Amino acid sequence: MNSLDYNKTNFLKSYSKITDIDIQNGIEIAFIGYSNTGKSSAINALTNQKKLARFSKTPGRTQLINFFEVVSGFRIVDLPGYGYSQAPLLVRSKWQKKVYDYLEKREQIKLFVLLMDIRYPLKKLDQKIISIAVQKKISILVLLTKCDKIKINHQKNQADMVFKKLNVLLDSFEIILFSSYKKIGIEKLKLSLNSSYKKHFILNR
C-alpha cells in the first residue's frame, strides 16, 4: 500500500485513564502539544472532516485521550493539550501526567507528532516530550503550526532554529511548516504518516 485514505478515518473511543485503554493490537501515532497549538484542527484537516476531532473554544478543556482509526491496526491518538495557563496548577499537573504516562508506557506508539506554534517553539513542556522520545528512541515529526501567521522568511528562520536544536538530540526527526486554516503542509504530513505505517506495520507483519 503506497497511500492511505485519511478521509475514511473514524473515531474509535475516548479514555480518561491510561489504565482503561483496552486497545492492544496495531500501532499508534501520537499527536501532542500545548493546548493552543491546534492538534484537533490538524487531525480534522488531515482527514478532511471538520468535526472528527472535537475541540473546545476554551483551550485546555479537552481532557480525554481520543483514538481514531485510519485503517485496521493503524491509529491516530489525540492527547490532552498541556500547559494551559488559566487552568489550576493541580489540574494542569494531572493533564501533563496523563500525557507523559501514555507516551512513556504505551508500547504501540511508533511516532510522536509534536505540534508547536511556529511563533513560540520549544517551550519547556515541548522539551519534556522530546526527552521522552530520546529515551524511547522514537522518531518525532514536528508540525510548526500557524505558519500562515508569519512571513515566509521568518518561517524559514524558525524552522532552521528548531532543526539546529533537535539535530543534537534526535537521530530521526522531520519538520513540516503547517497551517490547518490555509491547508499548508497537509500532503507532507500524509506522506510522513504513510511512511511510518509502511515501516512499522506493513513490513513487520
Swiss-Prot record:
It holds the Pfam family MMR_HSR1. This is Probable GTP-binding protein EngB. NCBIfam families: GTPase_YsxC. GO terms for cellular component: cytosol. Necessary for normal cell division and for the maintenance of normal septation. Belongs to the TRAFAC class TrmE-Era-EngA-EngB-Septin-like GTPase superfamily. EngB GTPase family. GTP binds at residues 33-40, 60-64, 78-81, 145-148, 178-180. Mg(2+) binds at residues 40, 62. Residues 25-199 form the EngB-type G domain. The keyword DNA-binding does not apply. Keywords: Cell cycle, Cell division, GTP-binding, Magnesium, Metal-binding, Nucleotide-binding, Septation. It comes from the Bacteria. One of its GO terms (biological process) is division septum assembly. Its cofactor is Mg(2+). One of its GO terms (molecular function) is GTP binding.
